[in-house]
Structures are given as structure tokens and as C-alpha cells.
């Protein structure tokens, strides 16, 4: 038995009906977006599992034509992350754009050269949020 099977044997309540879970999540997404009056969603895609799952669920909920995926790398971002993000976009078949955040981030931190990596990471997250709102 592999570790996941062992865990599920000890805690059977962790088992999920994948089809039902996807149906419930996509229905919830549609209902919440419809409340806003929007018919299309914009989603930041990083190449990680969280954004890949969100991308899959949004494509299921709104159809590929109802999703815009946005990749927002920084010059020090892992090339593999951008590659993974682009692969996820290709698999689900949605429209995508890439916005390089390097110019904005570097210009901002030129005034704060001693900023910690945590502070830089937080600024990048806020910059990405601003870009998503502006699209």
C-alpha cells in the first residue's frame, strides 16, 4: 500500500467523489460570477498546482472562451514555472496573455535597495493583483 492509500485506509472520510467535487465547485464558480454580472473570468496563472486547478475549474465552469489566463513572470521567476503555466493554458485551451512585471518591480525597488526577499515577494503579489484588475 502506498502512503496515500494508507492514509485513506485510516481516514476514509478523506475520500472524495472527484466528479461530484468538480460539479459542485464549477457550479459555485458560475453562481458567484453571475452575481457580479460578469460572463468571463480573468485568472492569474503561475505554473503552480493551485492556479492550474483554478484554471481547470474555470474552463469547466465558463468554457475556454470564458476565461483569460494571465502569466505575470518576474525576471527571477523560474523558467519552469512559466513553462508549466503555458502548458496548463494549452491543455485547457483558453486565451492567455503574458505581462512581464520586471519593469514595474525593478523601478519600485530602485528606491528601496535593501528590501528583503519577503517584501519583494509581497510587492510582486500586489503588482500581479493590480494587473489582473486592470485587465
Label for each model-derived stretch:
Residues 1-135:
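ATP-dependent adenylation/nucleotidyltransferase module used to activate substrates
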Amino acid at each position: 500500500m502506498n502512503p496515500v492509500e494508507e492514509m485513506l485506509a485510516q481516514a476514509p472520510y478523506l475520500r472524495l467523489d472527484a466528479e461530484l467535487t468538480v460539479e459542485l465547485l464549477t457550479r459555485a464558480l458560475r453562481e458567484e460570477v453571475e452575481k457580479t454580472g460578469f460572463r468571463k473570468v480573468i485568472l492569474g496563472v503561475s505554473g503552480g498546482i493551485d492556479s492550474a486547478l483554478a484554471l481547470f475549474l474555470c474552463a469547466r465552469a465558463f468554457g475556454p472562451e470564458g476565461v483569460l489566463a494571465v502569466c505575470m513572470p518576474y525576471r527571477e521567476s523560474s523558467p519552469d514555472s512559466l513553462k508549466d503555466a503555458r502548458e496548463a493554458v494549452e491543455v485547457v485551451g483558453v486565451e492567455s496573455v503574458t505581462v512581464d512585471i520586471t519593469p514595474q518591480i525593478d523601478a519600485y525597488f530602485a528606491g528601496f535597495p535593501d528590501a528583503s526577499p519577503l517584501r519583494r515577494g509581497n510587492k510582486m503579489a500586489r503588482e500581479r493583483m493590480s494587473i489582473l484588475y486592470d485587465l
